[in-house]
Regions:
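A short alpha-helical cap/connector motif
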Residues: 2-241, 245-269, 273-383
């Protein structure tokens, strides 16, 4: 299956090369980005020669030294060789200082290196020089997230939960390109649900221990058509991750449906529970960096389900909610679903980040602390 994915990534590079020749640079480099990000995953699995060949295919297709340097910097960025990436993009800028996308990559590399003032200056200059370039505004949100939530990103925290719990069963709602689903360990039966991405042809990642079971359905249709116990081959799941439709009412439905198959010590993780700014939490997407209004689920659960243990881990880019002490027999949320949705949709997202931290029940981004709450090594009640 990994060879299939590497072959698919090779074809994606060829498609991006064609787009680039046709003049569609945005689509071309969007495609390159996805490929280079995925290649780092496979390089980490020991497929260094194969990933290098795919990277070379993209590099050799570049029509000028400037574009070759840009592409090289992008590869180094995704391999996390940030100092070398900065050197490459600075060399490209020396050749073509008027190209906005070069400055944008420079700002991203500066962010990764921890030079937040330098990155802020870079993106601010882009906004002044090229107001039509929407990526600068989104990058400023990323910068703010880096400042407010330093340290590991949510993929790192997902990996921690897999390491702590070593789940026999893992259910993921909303797959993206498959990166989080591929974190499942060798003894985990992984199940992925997504109406658009629930096909191997649309994913870029596959678990090295064996492919997950995919369901190309909405989560509502999945739970209506399938008994999760039969799909898992067991009565309960160990770890669930909700990252589907970014609307409060859907996240709440997904939580209700998952909890019916939970044990008390099962854990449900919910992405996008700490928006970096109110505008990214709008119900209708108006920014590239977007969380939707999933944040509402945290105060909702705190109010209607005081029996649950809940916290939001302040991890970039948009927080990770974590819930345990679950009760499969509880019907409180389902019984009051309409009134809950009506009430919580009337609330505004707090303007200040410190206010959002309180409303979203933000805890400490400390591995020992979080493990103590959600992996059973202690019996904390202080959340």
């Amino acid at each position: 299956m990994i060879n299939y994915m590497l072959g698919k990534l090779t074809e994606q590079v060829r498609e991006s090369v064609t787009l680039q020749k046709d003049g569609d640079l945005a689509a071309a480099f969007g495609g390159y980005e996805l490929v280079f990000e995925a290649l780092r995953f496979y390089e980490g699995l020991g497929y260094g020669k194969e990933t290098e060949n795919i990277q070379r295919l993209a590099l050799e297709a570049q029509p000028s030294p400037m574009m070759t340097l840009y592409c090289h910097s992008l590869i180094l960025f995704h391999r996390r060789h940030y100092t070398c990436a900065l050197e490459a993009i600075e060399a490209a800028l020396a050749v073509a200082p008027e190209i906005t996308m070069l400055h944008a990559l420079r700002g991203r590399v500066q962010t990764a290196l921890g030079d937040l003032p330098g990155a802020y200056e870079t993106f601010s200059q882009i906004q002044s020089r090229d107001p039509a370039f929407g990526g600068a505004a989104d990058s400023l949100f990323v910068l703010t997230a880096e400042k407010e939530m330093p340290g590991e990103d949510y993929y790192d925290w997902l990996q921690h939960f897999h390491n702590w719990l070593r789940p026999a069963s893992y259910v993921e709602i909303g797959l993206g390109h498959g990166r989080s689903l591929a974190l499942a360990g060798p003894d985990t039966k992984a199940i992925g649900v997504d109406p658009y991405q629930g096909f191997w042809g649309r994913l870029n990642y596959v678990c090295p221990h064996g492919p997950a079971t995919l369901f190309p359905l909405t989560s509502d249709d999945f739970f209506a058509q399938y008994d999760l116990r039969e799909v898992m081959g067991r009565e309960t799941f160990d770890l669930g991750f909700i990252d589907g439709l970014h609307l409060f009412e859907q996240a709440l439905k997904d939580f209700i449906n998952l909890e019916r198959y939970a044990r008390k010590d099962s854990v449900i993780l919910i992405h996008d529970c700490l928006p970096i700014a109110p505008v990214v939490a709008e119900r209708e997407r108006c920014t590239g960096f977007w969380t939707g209004d999933v944040w509402r689920i945290i105060p909702c659960l705190k109010t209607f389900r005081p029996d649950l243990k809940i916290m939001t881990i302040p991890t970039k880019p948009s927080g990770l909610g974590a819930v345990t002490n679950l009760d499969a027999a509880s019907t409180v949320l389902a019984d009051h679903y309409d009134e809950i949705v009506h009430y919580y949709l009337s609330l505004n997202c707090p303007e200040r980040f410190d206010q959002r931290r309180v409303v979203c029940n933000v805890g400490i981004a400390d591995e020992d602390y979080v493990q103590g709450i959600f992996a059973g090594s202690t019996n904390r009640t202080d959340i």
